[in-house]
C-alpha cells in the first residue's frame, strides 16, 4: 500500500483574533507558544528540504489569523515561490484562513496546489467552539477554493464534546464539498484552553477514520493532530481503517512523532510513499 506523507510549516504563529476554544494560537488564551508575524524564507525552504528528505509529498504553509489580507497574501506567495525554486517536487498546500476567489487564484499562480480550510465540526456544534466567525464563512471559503481551481483539503477536529449526530452532520457537509483530502485531528486538551473534555480512546478514533472513509471514498483520509497521543501503539491501525495519509513531524504548536520513526515503522510494515499525486 502506498501512503502520502505531509509536513507542516507554521510560517506565522499566534496572536490570532479568533476565539476558537480548541486553539492555542488564539489571542484570547494565555499560552507559552512561540509567536511571530513571519518566518524567514530561508527557514521555510530549509524545512521544505527536510520534509522532502523525510519522504513528504505535501508541504503546508500555515498562517494564524482569520484570513488573508494583502500583506499576508504577498508573503505566502513569496514563500511558495521560494520553496518551489529549491524543492520543485513538493505539492504545496496553503492554510491561511478565509480567502476570496481572487486571493486564492493568486495563490494558485504562485504554485499552490491545494487549499486547506477545515470546517472543524458540524454547523450545529460550531457556535459552541467559536463565536468570532461563522461556520458558513468557512464553508464559503472552501467553495471559493474550488472555484479558484485549487484542490481542496478540508476536514476537522473530533473529540471536542460533539455528539454522534454532530459527526454525521459534519461528514454530510464534507460530502457536499468532496475534498481531494480530508484531515482528521483528535482534540488534545491543554490546561490553558477553555475547552476541557475527556480524551477520545483509540477505538473511538479508529471508528472515526472508518466512518470518514465510508462517507468520502474518493477522498484521501489524512490523520493529523492527536494521532500519537490518542492512538499510541495502535496509531498505524489507521491505514486498515481507511487512512491514506498522515502528517509527519511537528504540528502547529505541538510535537509530533519524529519523522524518521514513522518512516522506519511504516517501511517495516511494507508501506511505500507517494512521490506524485494521482
From Swiss-Prot:
It catalyses: (4R,5S)-dethiobiotin + (sulfur carrier)-SH + 2 reduced [2Fe-2S]-[ferredoxin] + 2 S-adenosyl-L-methionine = (sulfur carrier)-H + biotin + 2 5'-deoxyadenosine + 2 L-methionine + 2 oxidized [2Fe-2S]-[ferredoxin]. Its EC number is 2.8.1.6. Residues 1-227 form the Radical SAM core domain. The keyword Transferase applies. The keyword Transferase applies. Keywords: 2Fe-2S, 4Fe-4S, Biotin biosynthesis, Iron, Iron-sulfur, Metal-binding, S-adenosyl-L-methionine, Transferase. One of its GO terms (molecular function) is iron ion binding. GO terms for biological process: biotin biosynthetic process. [2Fe-2S] cluster binds at residues 60, 95, 153. PROSITE patterns: RADICAL_SAM (PS51918). Binds 1 [4Fe-4S] cluster. The cluster is coordinated with 3 cysteines and an exchangeable S-adenosyl-L-methionine. Binds 1 [2Fe-2S] cluster. The cluster is coordinated with 3 cysteines and 1 arginine. Catalyzes the conversion of dethiobiotin (DTB) to biotin by the insertion of a sulfur atom into dethiobiotin via a radical-based mechanism. Homodimer. This is Biotin synthase. It comes from Campylobacter jejuni subsp. jejuni serotype O:23/36 (strain 81-176). The lineage of its organism: Bacteria, Pseudomonadati, Campylobacterota, Epsilonproteobacteria, Campylobacterales.
